[in-house]
Amino acid sequence: MKIKIGKVEKRLNQIIEEEGAVYLTLLDPEEENIEEIAENVKDYADAIMVGGSIGIVNLDETVKKIKKITKLPIILFPGNVDGLSRYADAVFYMSLMNSANTYWVVTAPTLGAITILKYNLEPIPMAYLCIEPAKKTAVGYVGEIREIPQNKPKITAMYCLSAKFFGMRWAYLEAGSGASYPVNNETIALSKKLSGINIIVGGGIRKPEIAYEKVLAGADAIVTGNLLEENPKAVEMMYDAIKKAGKEKLKNK
């Protein structure tokens, strides 16, 4: 079986090439007002991620509800092997590379591989890296992470280079859901420069100006999740900031 890039990933790459950055919104399947949130983001996000670190309830129904509201690609962001749905378009096939538990590094994605094939989901190979202060968030606890310090950008960059050598085309630099502060610019810039793969940044990004500076630092994609639950209307300002920074980044190339 020949490995090839699927249509969702091609679309994301095209947006990055033409607009400089992608805006991904993360929806938690357990949110009661999931339809309202989807309605608020459908005109501004480039794709919708669905997933969470703790528990999955009626994932199929959640994805179907979102599909009725928007034609945006739905990318699964599984917290475990039960975070898969045949109704989604793609899945971030990820390894939590800096977990102390090999289950999260390789066993969980391996156990999910046959289901992904069976469901005909498009796998998007991605390194998932949890960076300070992620240890204080749900993903840090569940994923048993060896947290990468913010003041050691070379460590994150080396993980990204390793991911590239493993054949991964994306790396997600995660500060954690509800993080008190985001991944710093130096870490983003060095990770992008050393690896050259697509860099996603999420966690602790609550203001448009923060998203703007992360894109200029080298982020190819920005993820917001908690922001949508706290202030769904903020998505428009976030989108505008990301696209503005993307254009500037392309101009400066």
Swiss-Prot record:
Cofactor(s) the record lists: Mg(2+)
Subcellular location, record wording: Cytoplasm
Taxonomic path: Archaea, Methanobacteriati, Methanobacteriota, Methanomada group, Methanococci
Source organism of the structure: Methanocaldococcus jannaschii (strain ATCC 43067 / DSM 2661 / JAL-1 / JCM 10045 / NBRC 100440) (Methanococcus jannaschii)
Pfam families: PcrB
GO cellular component terms, semicolon-separated: cytoplasm
Record-listed E.C. numbers: 2.5.1.41
Top-level taxon: Archaea
Keyword Lipid metabolism: yes
UniProt pathway annotation: Membrane lipid metabolism; glycerophospholipid metabolism
Protein name: Geranylgeranylglyceryl phosphate synthase
Family assignment from sequence similarity: Belongs to the GGGP/HepGP synthase family. Group II subfamily.
Sequence positions that bind Mg(2+): 28, 53
